[in-house]
Amino acid sequence: MKYIGAHVSAAGGLANAPARAAEIVATAFALFTKNQRQWRAAPLTPQVIDDFKIACEKYHFSAAQILPHDSYLINLGHPVSEALEKSRDAFLDEMQRCEQLGLTLLNFHPGSHLMQIAQEDCLARIAESINIALAQTEGVTAVIENTAGQGSNLGFEFEQLAAIIDGVEDKSRVGVCIDTCHAFAAGYDLRTPEACEKTFAEFGKIVGFQYLRGMHLNDAKSAFGSRVDRHHSLGEGNIGHDAFRWIMQDGRFDGIPLILETINPDIWAEEIAWLKAQQIAEAMA
């Protein structure tokens, strides 16, 4: 079964996120468990935790259908020690918040070398940052998102994702989230079914489907291989509908959150309905 949804707002309280996901007839959702543009947040209260869990139960969302995202400020590969420690503390807090909420995944951008340290050193710092957080939490998997490779951001090549995983001690608690827009901008073609087959065969060989724990389904305003991160609505960008139809009809993408971060929330319900319909089309073929 495919879990299909979008990154919904938690404005007004975390319990509002599953309700908003239900409004667009989603079977998955992503959210921020705190303000993503601030370092600090008030601790979760027992009431907030209970309300969120009750809402998830009410709208039939299990932890496997929810892909929380951490703060954009965090850089787990930061070249400066003080800033690295600040990011590691913030990441641990994010992992602990997931743990408290009964969530089992935390999606994050790996990190940037800021042109100050070697790529290999940055990747090693990211892996060590994950190890530190995993050692102090239980039950939450660190889910590394591939990037478009904009600026000095790492994680845009499958080999970089594999290198981070290689440095993580507990392989059972590390995974990846593939963002289709990021992959396309990083030079992985998805414009035809044949291109999708080739790209994901490469992913399977270098990273491994056993590590795929979520996806972000986004079309791309950015050009192929441009290393520019610009999302678009499904079928309206440079990737086109074929990739998303192909994903919906491939069983390797079952049982993980497939999350829209497309640019027009007003049509998320339509995009989700279209994605669901592609599965039906395959079943009837």
From Swiss-Prot:
Keyword DNA damage attached: yes
Binding-site positions, Zn(2+) 3: 182, 229, 231
GO MF annotations in UniProt: deoxyribonuclease IV (phage-T4-induced) activity; DNA binding; DNA-(apurinic or apyrimidinic site) endonuclease activity; phosphoric diester hydrolase activity; zinc ion binding
Broad EC category: hydrolase
Entry's Gene Ontology BP terms: base-excision repair
Cofactor-binding details, from the entry: Binds 3 Zn(2+) ions.
Superkingdom, taxonomy of origin: Bacteria
Record-linked Gene3D superfamilies: Divalent-metal-dependent TIM barrel enzymes (3.20.20.150)
Binding site for Zn(2+) 2: 145, 179, 216, 261
Cofactor(s) needed by this chain: Zn(2+)
SUPFAM superfamilies: Xylose isomerase-like (SSF51658)
Binding positions for Zn(2+) 1 per the UniProt entry: 69, 109, 145
Keyword set, alphabetical order: DNA damage, DNA repair, Endonuclease, Hydrolase, Metal-binding, Nuclease, Zinc
Catalytic activity: Endonucleolytic cleavage to 5'-phosphooligonucleotide end-products
Pfam families, per the entry: AP_endonuc_2
EC number: 3.1.21.2
Xref: NCBIfam families: nfo (TIGR00587), PRK01060.1-4 (NF002199)
Annotated function: Endonuclease IV plays a role in DNA repair. It cleaves phosphodiester bonds at apurinic or apyrimidinic (AP) sites, generating a 3'-hydroxyl group and a 5'-terminal sugar phosphate.
Family of this protein: Belongs to the AP endonuclease 2 family.
UniProt name for this protein: Probable endonuclease 4
Species in which this protein is naturally found: Salmonella paratyphi C (strain RKS4594)
